[in-house]
Amino acid sequence: MCGVSLLVSSSSAYTSLKKARDSFYEDYQFADIFAEFKKAPFSIHHKLKSMPGVKLVQARILIDGLIYVRGQEETAVGRFVTLPEESKESLNKLYLRQGRFPELGEEVEVNVHEAFARAHKLKIHDELTVIIQGRSQKVRIVGIAISPEFVYALNPSAPMPDNLHFGIFWVPRKQLEYLAKMKDEVNSITLQLDHTLQAGAVIKKIDVLLKVYGNRGAYERKHQLSNIFVEDEIRQQKTMGMFLPSIFLLVAAFLVNIVIARLISLQRPQIATLKALGYTDYEVSSHYLKIIFVMMLVGTIPGIFLGWTIGSLLMNTYKTFFFFSDLTFYLSPLAILIGLLAGMIPCVLGGLFNLKTIFQLTPAEAMRPPIPAQFQPTFIERFELEKYFAIRSRMIYRNLLLRPGRLVALILGLSSSIAVIIIAASWQDMLDFVISNQFNRQQRHDVSVSFQNPLSESVMRELLRLNGVLLVEGYRNVPIRIRYKQYKREIPLMGRKNLNRLLKLIDKKLNQVTIPETGVLLTRFFDKQWGIKTGDRVVIEFLEGEFKEVELKVVGFIDDFMGLGAYMNDITLQNVLGEEPSYNVVNLKVDPVKLSEIYTKLKTFPLISSVIIKKELLRGFQETIGCMIKVFSSVMIFFALVISVGIIYNSIRVTFSERAWEMSSLMVLGFHRWSVFNLLAPEVMIQVFLAFIPGCLLGWLLVFLSVKLVHPETLDLPVIIYRSTFALSILFVLVVLAFSLMNIFRMISRLKLADALKIRE
């Protein structure tokens, strides 16, 4: 049931996400190529449209500003985008959830992204105050919308969605031109191609054309921020839907094998009688085939319904992150068919394997008790080690080694249970590790202030004078394009000092990394994915100012878990750019008591593009990831419970049924039920204990594989599993074992001693 439900839920979630993506992208014409630049005349779109292979072009303004929301002390960052025209040639069209599209008039009307509206409970006709390019303006919400460009609404400067402090707004072109001070000008274009295979050639032409306008680099849809997260989740669902259910299906095959083997063993006399009366092997086998078929239905049908429930729950969780026009759980006929086949496979593997016993049984042989198993000397006897074992210990290890196949299967099954718990808990471990290192060890500031343009050192002195500000550090962020062999990528480069105390760089061993006076430091992504090594040279093209191009030596790597980036010594960067000392990002360490007062004063500073309070960012990060982890962990732990109970309980039942006559005989001879219990319990406990180490190793392997499924551009997570997680998984199995042993003691107490006095023949 567990394997079927996981397979159905994962495959259906994959199908549902893919279907929602494809229909939304196609119906609302998601662009193939994107480009941002400093400023260009609106007429640039005519030149772009005349390029071979270009089907549609949309020129627009894309600019960030501050938003004042009633009831929220902190300002939010708004990304203001030109409203797409209502025509067939528009790209990245809006899907209206509520209201209407904005119209030109005395008031500035806007459409707001559903994520921001939902977070603040905004309604149609609500008013907000925004500041764009230092100009304050009241805007009225007339519609709540979504777009294929912002399915995953993420601030490019933040690692995770924070819908309380970041929102998308669409404004009519003329009004946005006025607010952005860009009359008849644009700073962003999107294109749709006749054939996406032409993307590389078209991008080269776009870069050449836009170079004089301060081009920051054109890029394909696959590098678009929202699309990266969408594709990453779809890919994870597809892969996880393959290897996780396989674990449960193998366990199911083992359980079916145990049940059928036990039935055939207990019913040997009846099988012999039927065969003696003339029933053929196939007729007797058909009885067990029917049992297998019923077991398949009992496991598969509820599994499909449980898969539908889990898939629906998963879709509801996705709706808080991914904003599609229609994201509904789609249980396809193919998923149902796959579920039925998946339920059939373990039954066939586990059941038919035992049916050969029926064909091998002759009536005369089956009417007698089974021939005692032939014990052969083990390595303990060969090395004469048995003298160090008590009689009871010899009985235990001989019983364990009598059926090595069953022992190995049981260990693998319990190992799967332990591994599933480790997978479920490890994501919380990795989340805690990232928070501890990214937000506490590396980022030691309380507030981060970004400016629209680089400012002189005087801005740091001005911020330091604010009451409650304890420490100020400035950085220079520059957009660059890095090139190495056939690779190229647009990333931010930060110029900083080595003595910075509020933003530290660390390596994978959590040691602080210093920036040499020459060269560039890169995030670990470029080592893993591009194969860049220390000492290699890369080409850095600066995407602002004079658009200089330099070749720099890679002097090392840092382990930043979120996003891509590069780092240089600030003085070296100033020399390369030919600038005086300037900063466009300033981090503040503040007195927590004065944080509210400082934030209020920061609102009055001109040219601020965003103010990020670390504790709010951390809270949003924990809520965003924590929600997904809770759903995932709950499902996995439930399935682990089913596996543990199924394997341990069935194993005990089989062992008990095989040795019930011997246990009854011992009790007739005067053994107390505790003494009989102590003969059986250690054997079961040893089998469980033998699964601990393989289970932990399997858990680590599965965590490693699941981490590798995450796109390295979104989260470059290390494989972190705390000791407490291993202990928790083992404790979980021990609790199941304890309840199972209590049950076996109860069964021993209820043994009918008269059965031991009967002649077995």
Q: How would you describe each model-predicted region?
A:
Residues 1-250, 262, 281, 438, ...:
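Membrane transport/envelope proteins' first extracytoplasmic loop
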Residues 273-282, 361, 400, 667-675, ...:
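Short helix-to-coil transition segments within interhelical loops
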Residues 1-30, 261, 310-318, 360, ...:
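Alpha-helical transmembrane segments
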Residues 26, 32-38, 391-517, 521-525, ...:
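Juxtamembrane segments of multi-pass membrane proteins
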Residues 1-2, 263, 280-281, 289, ...:
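N-terminal Sec/SRP start-transfer signal
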